[in-house]
Each structure stands twice: as structure tokens, then as C-alpha cells.
Amino acid sequence: MIKLTIDGQEIEVSEGTTVYQACTKAGKEIPHFCYHERLKIAGNCRMCLVEMEKSPKPIASCAMPVGNGMVIHTDTPMVKKAREGVMEFLLVNHPLDCPICDQGGECDLQDQAFRYGKGTNRFHENKRSIKDKYMGPLIKTAMTRCIQCTRCIRFANDIAGIEEMGAIHRGEHMEVTSYLEQTLDSEISGNMIDICPVGALNSKPYAFKARKWELRHTASIGVHDAEGSNIRIDSRGDEVMRVLPRVNEEINEEWLSDKNRFSYDGLKYQRLDQPYIRKNGKLVSASWDEALKAIADKIKSIKPEKITAFAGTLASVEAMFMLKTFLQKIGCNNYNVNQFDYKLDTTQRGNYLFNTTIAGLEKADLCLLIGANPRQIAPVLNSRIGGRVRAGSLKVARIGEGHNQTYKIQDLGSDLKILEELALDEHKFAEELKAAKYPIIIVGDGVYGRNDGHAILSLIHKIVDKYNIMRDDWKGFNILHNHASMVGGFDIGFDTSLGKLEDIELAYLLGADELPFDKLKSAFIVYQGHHGDIGATKADIILPSAAYTEQSGIYVNLEGRPQIAEKAVSPVGKAKEDIAIIKELADCLKLDTLVSNLQEIRTKLAKEYPIFANIGKIIDNKFAKFSSKDKLSKEPITAETINYYMTDVISKNSVTMARCVEAKQEMSSRGLSTGSRKKRE
């Protein structure tokens, strides 16, 4: 440990700590622009200057490592004068257009100029002006405001892993740019907006829409993937204005994927705002009483075993639990969250989770991707993997091509024989698995989305057992889930085995839109959802429900952590919350569902399933070796790129996401997208 004195206070810090970090530990506020705790140190804004005894000049505290016996002063006339001088230089070419800047009210430059600036300006010459750069449909630039802190450049290189930002020219003429002025290729590019300390990079969809003090903030969870990223929904009235990340060190740190951040405008379009009943082949509007009575009458006329319910990718745990309880009351035990027919083993919780945990990736030293594409399925999780690779602490190999990652990766091939050889210790990569202290295997839908998924999964379990990848001190087997509802559905047993879809007489769809509807031609379809997607067009009765921003709900992320998405705005039109709809349908059938409100549902959930008594936490889970007698096919393993920006009913109806798709297609046609070409190591 190193001892130093800061403003008369003696503190101890570990070796390698910077003076800035030591000052922060001592409770001192040091102004800064270029420094960011998750980025490499640049030391180019000079706003963090402090006085060090025996030094003739003030030092940049963010770049100076501590030394024994250092005496630091953070509030002397020298420091005050230095900060005023730095701020004056930073504002020399700044346009000072705060009234029309989207960053106004939440701008570091604005706040620090007020606190540390001189209040007067000696510069009377003409200011420089820089042409705004094009960075795609998500980021709006005003580069004249840029103070060259280089945070965006370091984020692109160190976190996103795509070196597409940089600086050109020197001195006063320096410009931050994306070189070719093309759409940024990263799936987490929107984070550059958050870390920009001025108004140079702003959200294009949010531009000129609102001020910070007009907005109501609601804590929620990102539901467009299975990561469970913590988000903050900013709303004005009953309109969602923007979505920002919340800090959670165990999941998303402070980053957020572009889909979770920008797809909120899809909540405005193609919404179901009133019940509909199909009459004479056409859907016509109806009252709630009429729609619920029609469903109740239909249920009474059908044998319970001929009724099946499917939950969609955005269904909350409470909604699925309420629907399951309702179905059991009418004698039906057919319900499933797995509308994609993924071949997963759900007999033990550890068999379908990301057992290493997201934060646990920081400990892994070898990663084997099998049919997995984490860049598009879990972009924030992927940034953790990339950071470890670039730090030289993790090696990544993959079985299954068809995608490109943002870090160095070793291609082992795509033949199923590779897995068989690994299981028998006959492949050269086996030596690396044996040598690794903390190896992990990540299995994607390129495996469990196949018809022979169970057979491949059985083979992977043999590899896990062979190389001791799941043990008391290390959990290295991981399933990479695609959808927010899957783990929660599995946790409450909403995954009963199904018979032939052709035999179903009534299908109750809880936001399910990805079913093989050609097999449900003879079924009476009830669709409970919030968007007019495929399921709604096939339905005989539509019950309009609330989106995730319009009702409170629990979602369990891929590592098995239950979290609550709070209600931010009211449902549109005559739409109702999911549990209210199911409760009214139960009342129509004169059923006692034993629960009448959200709190009662959560209390019952916690009693029946211990995981829901630990909101925000991960519990220990059992893992059991899985074996299958299914035969392997001869098809190679692939993990093809997907339409990342459109994977659910909200993102599919987002104008912003549509613009992203168009921009990516244009880049791909020009051969500029990293997703359109493969790199091999």
C-alpha cells in the first residue's frame, strides 16, 4: 500500500492507483472531461489539474500514479487559476449554444464552466467551425462543440471493439471523425452519446424532443434480449421519450445495446388499442365484455386437453404464472414459452442458464463458442468478452461459422466431428481445455435451434464432464438465450411437452407471434398482445394488452437473475394489463384464481419458486448431465448473422430500427460492415 496526503488528510491506496482515484477516495471532487473509469487514460483535457508539493507545475491527476509521501492540494490558488485557464481554452472555440443543445441541463461542460470557469471571456477573434459528421441514424453530431476528449474514440476501440472512430489533423484543426463518415457498425454505439461530456454527440431520435427536467424517470429492464440490462425509461405524460442505461456492475455495467436504447418508438405504431372479434372472416371491433364472453363460451365447448397456451418473447413472469394458474383451473396442462421449439434440457435449472454469470466472465481464461453469436444475441455481454480478449486474459475459439465478432477468435471449424473428437480427447484443442483453469462453453441457438439439438447438447455435456467444466468452484457451462421471457417461463414450468399442433382446438397466444400457424389452421386462436403482428392477423379474438413500459413485471435474465421492470406510462386506448385480462376472463368463467393483484401474484410466486424471493440476486442451481438417444445429422454447425435490429414486435415496428436496417444493408452492399465479412485468426 502507498501512503500520501491529500489536503491534509493521509490515506492509503494500492500501487498503480492514480492521483485522481486517490483524491476521489478521499472525498475530493476533481473536475474532468477526458477521464472515464471504464476507458483507458488519455490525459488530454487537463481539467483535473492539482498541485503536488515539490512540483513546479500542477499535475494531471488522472494520468499521474501515486507515490509514497506525495502531498497533494486540490483547492489552492494555483489549482483554481489552472482550472480557470483550462476552461477558458476549452471555451475558446466552443459555440456556447446551450439554449439549442440537447445536452443542456445535463452537460458536464456547462456544469464545470459554471463552477470552475472565470465568468468572463478574453477571446474576441473568430471561432472555428467544423462540419458535422454523419454517423448513421442513431447519433446526431455537432462537432463544433467537440472538446477532443477522445472518449468516443476510446470507447469504440476498447469497449465496442471496432476501430471506426479516430482523429485527423493536429492542434486547433484536430477533428474527431468516423473516417469514412459511415454508419457506425457497433451494436452498442449509442453509449458514445452517454459518455460524451458535451453536446457533440446526441441521440438523433431524441433530438429537440424534451429537456431533462420535463421527464419522469422509471427504473426498468431491457426486454429486447435476455441480458436483463438495467434501464431508465424517461417519459413525459404517457409518452416514452427516451431510454437510458442504469448502472449495474453485475450485468451491464453502464452500457446498453442500441436495440434496447432506441427501439422505444416502436411503442407508437401498430398498437392494439381495443378488442376485436373475427366475424365473416374479418376482424371487427368489440367491447371487452363481448370478447371475454365469446372466449369463455368457446372454452366451455372444448375439452381442456385440446387447449394450449403459448407465451411470446416479451411475456412477464407474472403474466405467464397467472395464465398457467387459469389453465390449471379449467383442467388444462398445456402451456409453453418455447414457441421456437428450442431443444433445451429444463430438468435442472443449471442446464438452461448462463451459469458463469455475466460478471463471472472476468475470471474466465478460455472460451469456446458453439453455435453462438454473442455479438448480436447479447451485445453488452459480448463487450465483456472482447475486453478480456484485448487485455490478453482470455482466448476465444468457436465451432460454427457464419458470424463475425469484435475480437480475435480461433476458428475450429463447423463439423460435428470436432465435438465428437473433443469428447474423446482426440482434438488438438483438447489440450487447451485441459490447460485452462477457468474454461467456459457458450452454447447458442445454432445448437439448440436445430432438430438434432438434443443430440448435440448431449455431446456437449460429455465435453463438460470430460474437462471438469462444471465443478464446485467454477461453473463453465452456459446457454446463450435470445429472448427475455424464456428463462422465467422455464423457471415456473411454463414449458409442458406438447402434442401435435394440428390437434389443438383453442390456442391462447400471450404475445406469441413466431408459431408455425399453418399447423393451427383448425384452431380457434385468441391473441393477447400489444402489437398487430402475425399472431394478431391470425387471431379469431384479439385482447389488447399493455407493453412492458405500461405494466410492472418480472423478467429473469439469461444468468437466472429475476428483476422488476416498473410501469412507466399508461396502456394505450382500451388496452389492459396482462394479469387484469386473465383475471377478468377467469371471472367470466366464475373461476377462483386465488390471486387478484400483482402483489398477491408475487407473494405466491415467491412461495412456490424460491428464486422469486430473491429479486435481483442469483441463487445456486443444480446441474445434471444430460443424455439423448437422438441421432446427429450431418449438417455443419452455424451461427448465422440475424436481423439484429428487428427481433420482436416492438423493434419490428420501430422506425429507428428500420433506418438502422437500411443503413446496415447499404454498408454491407459496399463491403464496409464488419458483420458482412469474416475475419480468421
Swiss-Prot record:
Keywords: 2Fe-2S, 4Fe-4S, Iron, Iron-sulfur, Metal-binding, NAD, Quinone, Translocase. Its cofactor is [2Fe-2S] cluster; [4Fe-4S] cluster. The lineage of its organism: Bacteria, Pseudomonadati, Pseudomonadota, Alphaproteobacteria, Rickettsiales. Transmembrane segments: none annotated. [4Fe-4S] cluster 1 binds at H94, C98, C101, C107. GO terms for cellular component: membrane. Pfam families: Fer2_4, Fer4_NDSU1, Fer4_Nqo3, Molybdopterin, NADH-G_4Fe-4S_3, NADH_dhqG_C. CDD domains: fer2, MopB_Res-Cmplx1_Nad11. Binds 1 [2Fe-2S] cluster per subunit. Residues 215-271 form the 4Fe-4S Mo/W bis-MGD-type domain. The keyword 4Fe-4S applies. NDH-1 shuttles electrons from NADH, via FMN and iron-sulfur (Fe-S) centers, to quinones in the respiratory chain. Couples the redox reaction to proton translocation (for every two electrons transferred, four hydrogen ions are translocated across the cytoplasmic membrane), and thus conserves the redox energy in a proton gradient. The gene is nuoG. GO terms for molecular function: 2 iron, 2 sulfur cluster binding; 4 iron, 4 sulfur cluster binding; metal ion binding; NADH dehydrogenase (ubiquinone) activity; quinone binding. Belongs to the complex I 75 kDa subunit family. The keyword Transit peptide does not apply. This is NADH-quinone oxidoreductase subunit G. It catalyses: a quinone + NADH + 5 H(+)(in) = a quinol + NAD(+) + 4 H(+)(out). Residues 1-78 form the 2Fe-2S ferredoxin-type domain. [4Fe-4S] cluster 2 binds at C146, C149, C152, C196. Residues 78-117 form the 4Fe-4S His(Cys)3-ligated-type domain. It is an enzyme of class 7 (translocase). Its EC number is 7.1.1.-. GO terms for biological process: ATP synthesis coupled electron transport.
